[in-house]
Regions:
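Acyltransferase
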Residues: 17, 23-29, 36-255
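Short, surface-exposed "cap/lid" segments of acyl-processing enzymes
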Residues: 1-13, 17-18
Length: 255
């Protein structure tokens, strides 16, 4: 799919600009997004968080630009987990440079995680899920409320696997997710949050100082519903690194 999309001028320009922004950072990747998108890389490269999160955001932004080149723009936007970065871009809350920088430092920071974590999708609402979690002494948390009957849980691998066995015995739908040992939106991410916030703040300051980002480069603003603070109207000028720190560690309130 990527090799086909890259043939479109608007999509390719978005990918190449993202690569250019990342190459300007003091802490930069040793790979290029365009190589990942076109398959010019090792097959398992996309499984690394710093690559998968960065490339996923770049592709999402490329699709936003592609649709915009056809005069197709959203009237409102919502994002899920790291998908909020591209959602903020599409809704005019972030520039392209701010968005790809946010994604890169998120992925790069979580590679420092040393805890063994897992995530579990379950076919129940958060209230019912909490009843099961009460027996696990804080080792598992609700990571995402996806719909009234779909919740994602996250935490210590041993506890998550045990819960999966319990749910299976009770006939409750559950599925372990492939996250490369990461327990996103759980206590595993809390120790990484401050480092992510500090590094991202420096990165955003850098791209602004070198002229790669200013507010005039944002899309016209449309409604964006935050899945961190779904009942708040966010001020784009206050959408700083602290927000993305919360996005990494807090539950996704998608529903």
């Amino acid at each position: 799919v990527g090799s086909q999309l890259i043939e479109n001028r608007a999509f390719r320009a978005a990918i190449e600009f993202s690569d250019y922004v990342l190459s300007s950072l003091p802490t930069k990747p040793n790979w290029k997004i365009v190589d990942i998108v076109t398959g010019e890389c090792a097959e398992n490269a996309i499984q690394k968080p710093e690559i998968s999160q960065t490339v996923c955001t770049a592709v999402q932004m490329g699709l936003v630009d592609l649709l915009a080149s056809w005069s197709i723009r959203p009237s409102s936007v919502v994002g899920h987990s790291s998908g909020e970065i591209a959602a903020a871009y599409a809704s005019g809350y972030l520039t392209a440079a701010e968005a790809i920088t946010t994604a890169w430092f998120r992925g790069n920071t979580v590679t420092k995680n040393t805890k063994d974590g897992s995530m579990l999708a379950v076919g129940m609402g958060p209230g019912k899920a909490e009843e099961y979690l009460a027996d696990f002494d804080g080792k598992i948390q609700i990571a995402a409320i996806n719909s009234p009957e779909s919740t994602t849980l996250s935490g210590d691998t041993t506890a998550v696997v045990r819960l999966a066995e319990i749910l299976k015995a009770k006939g409750e739908f559950n599925r372990l997710l492939r996250t490369g040992g990461m327990a996103y939106h759980s206590h595993h991410m809390q120790p990484l949050g401050q480092d992510y916030c500090a590094r991202l703040t420096e990165g955003l300051d850098h791209i602004r100082k070198v002229g790669l980002s200013d507010s005039s480069q944002r899309y016209p603003r449309v409604a964006w519903v935050s899945s961190v603070h779904p009942h708040k109207t966010l001020d784009p000028e206050k959408l700083n690194a602290s927000y993305w720190q919360m996005n990494l560690a807090s539950p996704v309130r998608f529903s």
